[in-house]
């Protein structure tokens, strides 16, 4: 009688559902998964080591490139670490701007996740819908920083500049003309805050569209209900944070439990799941988009009523205005020193974490008193989630691995660093 053996299969890194560069070695018994072994490191760029060779203020751009769909949330943890070690006070207006852009980033991330997750499972429409909304939010990034993705907008002491009074408009082209052009520019007549406010009015309707397509869809439920179940106790043991932990029923959110910036002044809820399966995590992230929309609305209202400075006036840490640099010798010296050698941070260490769209994103920073970090450690939420893949996938079918990778919301920039 011939021997029955499990066979080994490579999943990725070329697979379209591998979300970048995931290589999984799957051990299969027929079509049932016995073991799944993630092989990481294909996107390793040595970010932590590179940061040790750059002045503190020159590594912000590296943070954007960690989780490259949640750019400003990464920057936030890094600049908060520097501010904590230097004891810098951030103006209240800058704090509201940061919180507003953190939530815009959360929606951007969840739209990308929803579109890609649905596409992996076979629902193509949601992918196209999600990218329609992402376009508007990318325009907000571009309005404040000039870049659609890698913004480098957060700076130690505040943000790069205040919110613009005008929004860029679409111009006539072979793609946009006449009535369509007027429709596209309708919400771009006022300031950036007017544009964001108009978006927050439209967005709940868009989320309803996604839910109409997926939430009660029989095929979607068959592919996600009771797949990749993680109990609350096990989720804590595995180091889950963010929607992965809340999907298992634990209401842990740093914005509520360890408030930073102005989150303690804002009204929002923490959505939690009940069973800890892929479907629950889907519901949690969709509910989070609605909550983020609520927070953005509150920030817009406050920012419209309260003008003020958006960055600290300590020119040892923040650059002087261009007008000052052109007319004042001392300001020019500050500017030159800041952009050539940066500033020295007192000896010590700090750990700062933010409620990133994927979970707890933390920066552990050690300074030896020089102008560069002695050591920088990034605590990436996706790393802990990916480590649980073997446990979550065991006993499921090979097609369910795609649903489980999707529900974990893995981005390899932060996992491989």
Curated annotation (Swiss-Prot):
It is found in: Cell inner membrane. Keywords: Cell inner membrane, Cell membrane, Membrane, NAD, Quinone, Translocase, Transport, Ubiquinone. Disulfide bonds: none annotated. Belongs to the complex I 49 kDa subunit family. It catalyses: a quinone + NADH + 5 H(+)(in) = a quinol + NAD(+) + 4 H(+)(out). The keyword Cell membrane applies. PANTHER family: NADH DEHYDROGENASE [UBIQUINONE] IRON-SULFUR PROTEIN 2, MITOCHONDRIAL, NADH-UBIQUINONE OXIDOREDUCTASE 49 KDA SUBUNIT. The keyword Membrane applies. The gene is nuoD. One of its GO terms (cellular component) is plasma membrane. This is NADH-quinone oxidoreductase subunit D. It comes from the Bacteria. Its EC number is 7.1.1.-. NDH-1 is composed of 14 different subunits. Subunits NuoB, C, D, E, F, and G constitute the peripheral sector of the complex. PROSITE patterns: COMPLEX1_49K. It is a peripheral membrane protein.
């Amino acid at each position: 009688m011939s021997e029955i053996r499990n066979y080994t299969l490579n999943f990725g890194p070329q697979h379209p559902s591998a979300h970048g560069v995931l290589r999984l070695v799957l051990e299969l018994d027929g079509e049932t998964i016995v073991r799944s072994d993630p092989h990481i490191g294909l996107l390793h760029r040595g970010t932590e080591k590179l940061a040790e060779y750059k002045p503190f203020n020159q590594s912000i751009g590296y943070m954007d490139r960690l989780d490259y769909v949640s750019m400003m949330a990464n920057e936030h943890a890094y600049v908060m670490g520097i501010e904590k070690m230097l004891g810098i006070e951030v103006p209240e207006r800058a704090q509201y701007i940061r919180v507003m852009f953190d939530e815009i980033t959360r929606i951007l991330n969840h739209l990308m996740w929803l579109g890609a997750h649905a596409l992996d499972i076979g629902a193509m429409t949601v992918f196209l819908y999600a990218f329609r909304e992402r376009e508007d939010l990318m325009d907000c990034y571009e309005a404040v920083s000039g870049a659609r993705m890698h913004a480098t907008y957060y700076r130690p002491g505040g943000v790069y500049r205040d919110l613009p009074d005008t929004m860029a408009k679409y111009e006539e082209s072979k793609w946009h003309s006449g009535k369509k052009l007027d429709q596209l520019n309708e919400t771009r007549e006022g300031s950036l805050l007017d544009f964001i406010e108009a978006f927050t009015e439209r967005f709940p309707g868009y989320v309803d569209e996604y839910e109409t397509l997926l939430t009660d869809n029989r095929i979607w439920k068959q592919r996600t209900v009771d797949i990749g179940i993680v109990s609350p106790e096990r989720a804590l043991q595995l180091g889950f944070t963010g929607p992965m932990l809340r999907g298992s029923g634990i209401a842990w959110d740093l914005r509520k439990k360890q408030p930073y910036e102005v989150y303690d002044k804002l009204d929002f809820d923490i959505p939690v799941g009940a069973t800890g399966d892929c479907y629950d995590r889907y519901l949690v992230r969709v509910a989070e988009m609605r909550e983020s929309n609520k927070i953005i609305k509150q920030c817009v209202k406050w920012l419209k009523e309260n003008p003020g400075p958006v960055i600290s006036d300590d020119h040892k840490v923040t650059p002087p205005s261009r007008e000052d640099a052109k007319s004042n010798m001392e300001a020019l010296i500050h500017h030159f020193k800041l952009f050539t050698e940066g500033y020295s941070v007192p000896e010590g260490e700090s750990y700062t974490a933010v409620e990133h769209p994927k979970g707890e994103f933390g920066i552990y920073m050690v300074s030896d008193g020089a102008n560069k970090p002695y050591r920088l450690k990034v605590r990436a939420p996706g790393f802990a989630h990916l480590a649980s893949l073997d446990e979550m996938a065991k006993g499921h079918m090979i097609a369910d691995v795609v649903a489980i990778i999707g529900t974990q919301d893995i981005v390899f920039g932060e996992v491989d660093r």
